[in-house]
Amino acid sequence: MKPWILLLLAGLLILSTQLTTAKTTKQLRLPKVKPGECPKVKIPPDYPCNQYCVWDFDCEGNKKCCPVGCAKECFPPGPL
């Protein structure tokens, strides 16, 4: 067998191992949603558009990350 073929096969083997490892280590797991629903919140027209959370688990305790206008904030959950 020619040396360049062996080199090519070895390179493909290494590359396939690296790709398989990259796929398994980079899987994202989204956090679970906390129980309850976001409360209905009335907001004033000049309410600031600040992002205080993205997921429920960004909030302390049992609070949920709820949309408030163009923002998201942590609130105690409402009833199911």
Curated annotation (Swiss-Prot):
Any one of the GO BP annotations: venom-mediated disruption of cell wall in another organism
Domain of life (superkingdom): Eukaryota
Keyword Ion transport applies: no
Tissue: Expressed by the venom gland.
Molecular function, one GO term: serine-type endopeptidase inhibitor activity
InterPro entries: Elafin-like_sf, WAP_dom, WAP_four-disulfide_core
Family: Belongs to the venom waprin family.
Function according to Swiss-Prot or TrEMBL: Damages membranes of susceptible bacteria. Has no hemolytic activity. Not toxic to mice. Does not inhibit the proteinases elastase and cathepsin G.
Name the record gives this protein: Waprin-Phi3
